[in-house]
């Protein structure tokens, strides 16, 4: 039947008249649908004319609901004439809670439609969130009204009980629907005021329930009450929304990334601040989901493994100091920081110990194998030493210290107890003994120079005996006093410069102080890098010499520029003095002037030798005369010769190499007796020269023992690159952790070949694994190794390797699960680590990190023995490894910076290009796994990355990957719901996902 449309009557009025006629004539649902479509404009929703409002007004006019109108309402919903949002919003306005029959009818209607709630248009999406909040609030009001009635009458009528039961059923359906919970969660951000009222109403219901003695009815077989459902909705958080976990459930039993990470930090960033370690370890904890106790245990275990690997080497003292002095400081800092960040976890602030530390030692005791091995290796009870250091930092008290130590007593009864006065050889004991001397040296260095010259000389030279200097440096480094120590030595060296007219004992003492302080400073710079220990802007003699004349790795310096800086008149005078019988004793040049002009001297001597103006014997005598006066002269000469050897041909290397070798030959006993502490100074001189030889001479080191003794990172090797890597990786697989020598070799490969080559080789090792356990283990080790230069390696992985794998340019098999999942996890770990990497001066530098002077030099001569690699193996990023500022609060997401931001944008655009068909391929599933792991592992920290995802990527992926892996929790975690655009995109994706699910369910039916 078609109704006559009068121009003067609005369509809303027409709809109301139509409703009355439909009721009078008892239209069927089909008749109603036909006639109402004649009134509504094609393509226009009935919401525009308040159709849902009109129907519901007529449906609940009397004491009972009109089922005919409710059937019209349901038909209109099914025919998409009105939206679910409009219906829910209108129902939530009904406030006649005493009309039990109407309430029951409305609740039954809700129960029948709530499972199919969705959106069909953009306008509806914005309304549905508030409508769902209003509906939940309305249900809570009904329930509260029932409890109030019970409180007054001490009982409920049959109708009231049915209202409570129906309310519970609707709430149950809402809570059991992830889509509806997701809509409520979005509404929490869309209308915080209404959600606040909802949360407040929940508390009121809780209090009223307790006060009235009302027993909440059990809704399901799981003994869940209405109050439980209300509480779940009112306290909804991200964790409430389910997500498919690709990273596995629970915490992994064994972690393989901590030991390689600590090994890399110890070797290449020894002067790192405690807070930098704290941020790095907390980042690993968040990625792995460790509790603090597990984190502490893993740190200690990793350090003990590293210490075992370096026994008997020059690095042993530093790693020992790091383990027993630095680690307690790090744990103390983590303890304090976590108390600030998570105060609820530390309710009892009066504890004189950390329960996490106690639990960490309990976990450590379970790994008795490494403890037994280290006790025997270090000739001490390592647990007892660690406990004593923890006591100093108030991380554990006497009671628990004794309890934990007692558990090891039975095993270590044959070992000597901790006693610093015993003569038993123990590196741990020696390291701890080095703390008091360090304090004394720093105090003396800060005293009046004129009053402590002899005492200072004796103290410094005594330190040079044995390995005391390395012990002192190790302790100074881990305690953060290395810069203070260096500043004191520079001050001493500056004060010890030659004073005209000074004679006798004072002059000899001053000369020895100048020499020994210079040697010690060179040794420190050689091992710790000039950036980490020297201060910018200062102009002392030593710092000027380091900047202009000292050869350093990754800092090319032109030897000819050094020659140009020399004063030719002083060079000539120096030559005359060395040719005289008295040698340098008769020269008027000051010590510091000789050091500065040695490059010019050696250049002329080399030219004379090559032109056969001087014989080999004369050269030897010449060099012996130079080195006999001061040891620092040998260092200055060797430094220039090493720089000079970088620019000459292979057939010209022999003469400068022989000159360097002459500086390490023994001197006569008579000369040894003429100068104070010459033996100690010569010992340090030989160490410095040997390291320069290994680092800068263009010949491979044949003796592994020599490379093990010296901290060499020589790029020179006779073996092909592939063989070097395979040999290193074979050792890693055999041990299950990263040996120190392997770490150095991998750093060499990174510097030689660039990050792409190394990352490619590392990722290939994951694909060689047969079992998931092996894949995860290898992935952990690969992730840690990439911290050699985490930014550049991450960029190489994301911008080069992953796109090439997707395009199959590497001619490898298809990226399929579980390989794709492990690769995606590696990508996510690297993204988070790069974002959160602290900004510190570091020795992990790229070959591009050289001065302009070096750039000019490289145009003349390439770095010796550098392999020529194809363009595909070169790194696209040549920038220095510069990290961003350290964040004060971990809960604030680290901002994305270039080049990571641009790299991720390009990667996501690449993903969009692949999603062009409706076919689910392994490549598309890898993209989904990557995004899922981003939100699963990265959580709130990854928000800046998620903002880069192109619009439409998720919806296109949902249309293809409409599997159980796609969840509401995943979708909502992708967006920042604090922003209007984030909520809009989230609701759009949610509704599309809902409609896809409903279509699948209808097909199954």
Curated annotation (Swiss-Prot):
Signal peptide: none annotated. It is found in: Nucleus. GO terms for biological process: positive regulation of transcription initiation by RNA polymerase II. Its main location: nucleus. GO terms for cellular component: mediator complex. PANTHER family: MEDIATOR OF RNA POLYMERASE II TRANSCRIPTION SUBUNIT 24. Component of the Mediator complex, a coactivator involved in the regulated transcription of nearly all RNA polymerase II-dependent genes. Mediator functions as a bridge to convey information from gene-specific regulatory proteins to the basal RNA polymerase II transcription machinery. Mediator is recruited to promoters by direct interactions with regulatory proteins and serves as a scaffold for the assembly of a functional preinitiation complex with RNA polymerase II and the general transcription factors. Belongs to the Mediator complex subunit 24 family. Component of the Mediator complex. This is Mediator of RNA polymerase II transcription subunit 24.
């Amino acid at each position: 039947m078609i109704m006559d449309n009068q121009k003067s009557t609005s369509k809303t009025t027409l709809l109301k008249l139509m409703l009355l006629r439909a009721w009078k004539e008892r239209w069927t649902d089909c008749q109603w649908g036909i006639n109402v479509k004649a009134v509504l404009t094609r393509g226009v929703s009935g919401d525009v004319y308040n159709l849902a409002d009109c129907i519901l007004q007529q449906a609940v006019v009397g004491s009972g609901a009109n089922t005919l109108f409710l059937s019209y309402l349901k038909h209109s919903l099914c025919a998409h004439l009105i939206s679910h949002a409009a219906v829910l919003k209108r129902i939530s306005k009904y406030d006649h809670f005493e009309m039990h029959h109407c309430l029951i009818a409305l609740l039954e209607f809700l129960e029948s439609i709530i499972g199919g709630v969705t959106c069909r248009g953009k306008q509806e999406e914005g309304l549905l969130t508030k409508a769902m909040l209003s509906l939940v609030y309305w249900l809570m009001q009904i329930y509260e009204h029932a409890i109030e009635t019970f409180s007054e009458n001490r009982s409920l009528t049959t109708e009231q009980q049915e209202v409570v039961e129906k309310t519970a059923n609707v709430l149950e359906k809402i809570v059991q629907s992830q889509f509806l919970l997701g809509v409520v969660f979005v509404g929490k951000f869309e209308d915080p005021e209404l959600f606040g009222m909802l949360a407040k109403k929940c508390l009121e219901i809780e209090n009223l329930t307790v006060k009235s003695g009302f027993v909440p009815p059990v809704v399901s077989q799981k003994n869940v009450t209405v109050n439980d459902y209300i509480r779940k909705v009112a306290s909804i958080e991200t964790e409430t929304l389910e997500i498919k976990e690709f990273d596995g459930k629970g915490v992994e039993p064994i972690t393989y990334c901590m030991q390689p990470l600590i090994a890399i930090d110890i070797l290449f960033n020894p002067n790192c601040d405690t807070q930098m370690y704290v941020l790095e370890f907390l980042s690993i904890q968040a990625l792995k989901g460790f509790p603090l106790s597990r984190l502490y245990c893993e740190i200690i275990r990793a350090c003990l493994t590293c210490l075992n690997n370096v026994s008997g080497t020059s690095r042993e003292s530093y790693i020992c100091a790091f383990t027993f002095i630095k680690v307690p400081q790090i744990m103390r800092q983590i303890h304090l920081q976590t108390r600030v960040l998570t105060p609820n976890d530390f309710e009892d602030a009066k504890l004189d110990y950390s329960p996490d530390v106690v639990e960490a030692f309990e976990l450590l005791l379970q790994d008795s194998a490494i403890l037994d091995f280290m006790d025997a290796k270090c000739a001490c009870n390592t647990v007892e030493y660690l406990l004593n250091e923890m006591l100093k930092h108030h991380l554990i008290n006497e009671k628990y210290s004794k309890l934990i130590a007692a558990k090891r007593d039975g095993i270590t009864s044959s070992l000597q107890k901790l006693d610093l006065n015993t003569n038993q050889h123990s590196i741990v004991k020696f390291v701890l003994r080095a703390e008091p001397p360090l304090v004394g040296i720093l105090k003396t260095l800060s005293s009046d120079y004129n009053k402590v010259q002899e005492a200072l000389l004796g103290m410094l030279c005594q330190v040079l005996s044995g390995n005391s200097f390395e012990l002192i440096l190790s302790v100074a480094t881990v305690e953060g006093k290395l810069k203070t120590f260096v500043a004191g030595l520079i001050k001493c060296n500056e004060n010890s410069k030659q004073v005209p007219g000074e004679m006798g004992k004072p002059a000899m003492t001053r000369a020895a102080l100048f020499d020994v302080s210079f040697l010690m400073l060179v040794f420190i710079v050689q091992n710790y890098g000039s950036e980490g220990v020297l201060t910018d802007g200062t102009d002392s003699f030593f710092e000027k010499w380091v900047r202009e004349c000292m050869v350093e790795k990754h800092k090319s310096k032109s030897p000819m520029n050094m020659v140009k800086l020399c004063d030719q008149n002083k060079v000539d005078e120096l030559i005359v003095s060395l040719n005289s019988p008295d040698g340098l004793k008769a020269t008027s040049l000051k010590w510091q002037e000789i050091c500065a002009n040695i490059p010019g001297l050696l250049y002329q001597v080399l030219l004379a030798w090559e032109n056969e103006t001087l014989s080999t014997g004369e050269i030897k005598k010449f060099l012996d005369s130079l080195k006999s006066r001061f040891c620092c002269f040998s260092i200055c000469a060797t430094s220039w010769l090493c720089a000079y050897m970088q620019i000459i041909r292979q057939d010209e290397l022999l003469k400068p190499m022989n000159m360097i070798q002459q500086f390490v030959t023994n001197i006569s006993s008579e000369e040894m007796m003429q100068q104070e502490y010459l033996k100690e100074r010569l010992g340090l001189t030989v160490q410095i020269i040997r390291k320069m030889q290994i680092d800068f001479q263009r010949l491979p080191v044949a003796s592994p023992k020599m490379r093990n003794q010296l901290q060499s990172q020589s790029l020179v090797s006779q073996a092909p690159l592939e063989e070097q890597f395979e040999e290193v990786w074979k050792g890693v697989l055999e041990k299950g952790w990263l040996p120190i020598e392997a770490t150095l070799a991998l750093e060499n490969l990174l510097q030689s070949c660039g990050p792409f080559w190394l990352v490619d080789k590392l990722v290939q090792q994951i694909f060689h694994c047969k079992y998931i356990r092996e894949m995860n283990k290898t992935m952990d080790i690969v992730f840690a190794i990439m911290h050699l230069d985490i930014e550049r390696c991450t960029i190489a992985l994301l911008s080069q390797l992953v796109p090439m794998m997707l395009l199959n340019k590497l001619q490898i098999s298809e990226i399929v699960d579980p390989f794709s999942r492990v690769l995606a996890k590696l990508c996510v770990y690297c993204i988070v680590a790069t974002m959160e990497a602290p900004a510190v001066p570091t020795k992990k530098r790229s070959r591009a990190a050289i001065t302009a002077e070096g750039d000019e030099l490289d145009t003349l001569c390439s770095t010796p023995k550098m392999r020529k690699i194809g363009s595909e193996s070169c790194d696209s990023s040549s920038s220095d490894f510069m990290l961003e500022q350290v964040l004060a609060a971990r809960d604030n997401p680290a901002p994305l910076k270039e080049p990571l931001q641009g790299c991720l944008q390009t990667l996501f655009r690449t993903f969009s290009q692949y999603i062009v068909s409706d076919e689910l391929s392994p490549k598309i599933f890898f993209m989904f796994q990557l995004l899922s792991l981003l939100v699963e592992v990265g959580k709130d920290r990854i928000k800046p990355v998620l903002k880069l995802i192109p619009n439409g990527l998720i919806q296109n992926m949902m249309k293809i990957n409409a599997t159980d892996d796609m969840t509401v929790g995943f979708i909502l975690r992708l967006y920042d719901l604090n922003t209007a655009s984030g909520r809009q995109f989230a609701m759009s994706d949610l509704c599309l996902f809902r409609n896809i699910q409903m279509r699948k369910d209808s097909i199954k039916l």
